[in-house]
Design a protein with these regions (language model features):
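Catalytic histidine-centered segment of alpha/beta-hydrolase-like enzymes
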Residues: 224-234
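Conserved alpha/beta-hydrolase catalytic His-Asp/Glu region
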Residues: 127-170
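Conserved HGGG/HGGXW glycine-rich cap/lid loop of the alpha/beta-hydrolase fold
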Residues: 2-41
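Short beta-strand/loop motif that positions the catalytic acidic residue
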Residues: 187, 193-195
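Flexible "cap/lid" loop of the alpha/beta hydrolase fold
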Residues: 90-122, 165, 171-172
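Conserved alpha/beta-hydrolase "acid-adjacent" motif
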Residues: 200-206
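Gly/Ala-rich beta-loop-alpha elbow adjacent to hydrolase catalytic centers
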Residues: 68-72, 76
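Active-site loop/oxyanion-hole signature of alpha/beta-hydrolase fold enzymes
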Residues: 33-64
Length: 235
């Protein structure tokens, strides 16, 4: 029997997955919703691995599929690399990672410089600390495909992450890449990745980098935003 384990992203906890719980129950799918500890990056790593091990211990006869959205996708990848073939499948949704080093030509093409990076970090820190207006944050995460009622409901459960955790997160590229130096869980039959073409927070190139790194199968949903694949009936 398959058992799905769901990891959330930044600024929300397991409430994010409540929208699909009725479908899981309707199809008699076994699942667990995990609240990751975002008090620090180290605690997040520890809680992701510990939670999965505890669920496995509780249900020893099941095949486990880890599903992660956004940053939760990176933690799902981390757990899969740590546990290897004990994991049955890995699915990550709208998750990306930049390589350690980017060639100068690519840097020029992407028009990245120190100033733009600083502005982005400030903007993202304001976003996840709850200092941006709702109309702006919703447009970053959703398209019109997600009903307004669902957007409002999720906004009730948003979490203001600490500045310390956010700064750790924004400066963690080398840490994540170091965890992927040796791949222990990969391949198109084992790893599925899903992306929305209108995602405004995760660059497509960062998503494709993970696809290549994990030799994963993937699907891109045209017109979908960062959250829509989960929150919109259309997908």
């Amino acid at each position: 029997m398959n058992h799905f384990i769901f990891f959330h992203g930044v600024g929300i906890r397991s409430h994010f997955w409540n929208i699909i719980v009725p479908k899981l129950k309707e199809r008699s799918i076994e699942y667990s919703l995990v609240d990751l500890d975002f008090s620090s990056l180290d605690n997040a790593f520890e809680s992701s691995l510990k939670s999965v091990k505890e669920i496995m211990k509780e249900y020893p006869d099941r095949s486990f599929i880890i599903v992660g959205h956004s940053l939760g996708g990176l933690f799902a990848i981390y757990v899969a690399q740590q546990l290897g073939d004990i994991i049955h499948k890995l699915i990550f949704v709208n998750t990306g990672l930049a390589p350690k080093r980017v060639a100068m030509k690519a840097m020029q093409q992407m028009q990245i410089n120190r100033l733009s990076k600083l502005i982005k970090k400030i903007g993202m820190r304001m976003l996840f600390s709850g200092k941006l207006p709702k109309w702006l944050t919703r447009s970053l995460y959703f398209t019109d495909d997600t009903p307004e009622a669902i957007k409002i409901e999720l906004s009730k459960h948003k979490v203001r992450e600490s500045r310390e955790f956010l700064m750790e997160h924004f400066n963690s590229k080398s840490i994540w890449n170091s965890h992927l130096e040796r791949i222990h869980f990969s391949g198109p039959d084992n790893v599925l990745s899903v992306f929305g073409s209108k995602d405004k927070t995760t660059p497509k190139r960062a998503f494709m980098y993970l696809i290549k790194k994990l030799n994963a199968s993937y699907t891109i949903y045209e017109g979908s935003g960062h959250n829509d694949i989960i929150t919109a009936q259309k997908y």
